[in-house]
């Protein structure tokens, strides 16, 4: 199971102050990680499935400038942080 506190702490350490980060888990083991750019108020959402360990992003999220120029190059870092935060 993903330790939300640990994941948030590690993601914040890596991405603050560029993005504010929120994590929310549903009852199916899927956690939504929201990266909000305070300058533009745009939110980019990633999904992490604890059952398959897959990190996904919807095509409409990939089109956002904040993803293309702010997060895209860091997807491997994000996946590693999430995997390291599993218990």
Summary of predicted features, one role per range:
Residues 1-32, 57-71:
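Negatively charged, low-complexity tracts enriched in Asp/Glu with abundant Ser/Thr
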Residues 15-16, 20, 35-37, 41, ...:
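Short, flexible coil/linker elements and helix-boundary hinge sites characteristic
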Residues 30, 41-43, 77, 81:
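N-terminal functional modules and adjacent low-complexity/disordered segments of proteins
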Residues 32-51:
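A short, structured beta-strand/loop element
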Residues 48-87:
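C-terminal basic regulatory modules in eukaryotic proteins
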């Amino acid at each position: 199971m993903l330790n939300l506190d640990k994941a948030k702490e590690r993601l914040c350490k890596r991405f603050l102050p560029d993005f504010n980060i929120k994590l929310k888990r549903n009852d199916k083991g899927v956690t939504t990680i929201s990266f909000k750019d305070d300058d533009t108020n745009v939110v980019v959402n990633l999904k992490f499935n604890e059952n398959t360990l897959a990190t996904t992003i919807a095509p409409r999220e990939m089109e956002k400038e904040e993803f293309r120029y702010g997060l895209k190059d860091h997807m491997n870092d994000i996946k590693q942080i999430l995997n390291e935060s599993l218990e």
